[in-house]
UniProtKB/Swiss-Prot annotation:
Keyword Chloroplast listed: no
Gene Ontology CC terms, in alphabetical order: tRNA methyltransferase complex
Pfam families, per database record: Methyltransf_4
Binding of S-adenosyl-L-methionine, residues: E46, D73
Name of the molecule in the record: tRNA (guanine-N(7)-)-methyltransferase
Enzyme Commission number(s) of this protein: 2.1.1.33
Pathway of action: tRNA modification; N(7)-methylguanine-tRNA biosynthesis
Gene3D superfamilies referenced in this protein's UniProt entry, alphabetically: Vaccinia Virus protein VP39
Highest rank taxon of the organism: Bacteria
Length: 185
């Protein structure tokens, strides 16, 4: 199902009956999660038409009713999601592009409003410098608390599939680190 959105905020209660999760991805890992967790609804936010069409075709192939795809900025009402997932997003490793990194204070402020109390943020990356930046932003944010004490990184949960970017990065010195924080607003 392709959603046609106006300037109004997305009303997920009208789309789904059950709890929702939000994900930014090329769709492959989210598709696997949606297949394995049919009782949970997922919203994929994608900007590339080819990825959208491919994912729509796969949702029809697997007859998934718990996965929706949108091609816009995610304008939703507050307390609308129980979790947010970001797996191996672009690290923008050159210093002049660091401002383009998604996980920064302003973005975390938006997430803290959108995610329910005790909802989770789950991020995975293979770039050590980026994970340090993300960890600092999350640790210093008023509303987010790490679910881990020591070690500070989480093991990859069994429900998180290995993404295509993760498969490419599986080589010595390129460990994928998972960060799972809870929203304590």
């Amino acid at each position: 199902m392709r959603l046609d959105l106006s300037k109004d905020k997305i009303n997920l209660d009208a789309l789904f009956v059950k709890q929702q999760k939000i994900d930014f991805d090329n769709g492959d890992s989210l598709l696997k999660i949606a297949i394995n967790m049919p009782d949970i609804n997922f919203l994929d936010i994608e900007i590339y038409e080819t990825s959208i069409n491919r994912l729509i075709n796969k949702t029809h192939k697997y007859q998934l009713s718990n996965l929706k795809i949108i091609q816009v900025d995610a304008h939703t009402k507050d307390n609308n999601f129980d979790s947010f997932q970001l797996f191996l997003s672009g690290p923008w490793y050159k210093k002049k592009y660091h401002k383009l990194r998604l996980v920064q204070t302003a973005f975390l402020d938006l997430l803290s409003k959108t995610i329910i109390h005790n909802g989770k943020i789950h991020i995975a990356t293979d770039w050590v410098r980026y994970v340090t930046t993300m960890m600092n932003a999350l640790k210093n944010h008023l509303h987010f608390k790490n679910t881990q004490n020591d070690p500070i990184y989480s093991l990859r949960p069994g429900h998180r599939p290995i993404t295509k970017f993760e498969r490419r990065s599986h080589r010595p010195g390129h460990d994928v680190l998972d960060l799972i924080f809870k929203n304590e607003k």
